Amino acid sequence: SNLCGHATLAAAHVIFEHLDFPEATIHFATRFVGPLTVTRSGDWLTLDFPAWQSEPAEPPALLLETLGITEYKEVRVARDYMVVMENQQQVEAVRPNIHAMIPLGKMVCITAPGDGEYDFVSRFFCPGEAVAEDPVTGSTHSMLIPYWAAKLNKTQMLARQVSERGGDLRCQLTGTRVYIGGQAVTYLTGKVLLR
């Protein structure tokens, strides 16, 4: 993929936490998606990513088969497939065969309106990758935020990725950009000795 939220967030976290970066915003120049910025506010880091519009799609039989579902509200496509479901319980209940998704040639996101404080929830499956279900996915929110902003008629939302580990994302749509807020923690520090 040409856009990776994990790497952007991790790089920003290291710059802010370990390199004593004095500003509140970091500007990254990227090869494929142009400039990306990350802004720090307390414990939260906000990524400024391009907004991706999705198109309605006729779901391939394999998509529904590998998700183990027959019912869905709609299927859309951008970089990834997006399968919209009725509610959060349906999203949590999916037990996909992720390896069998490889012939689809795309990653697969499932989403639905959220319960309680959450505007929407999602899960993200990565066929053929080392991590079969991504715990939290910044880049797929480039597609989810414009979709839910239009559906819910609001530009600021709280989302939850309901993977096993899970994570909250503060979401905002501003024109052709999305702002995705998340939290990062340092779990490992080490030294590399160059000889």
Where are these regions (language model features)?
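Active-site proximal loop and beta-alpha junction motif in alpha/beta enzyme cores
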Residues: 1-195
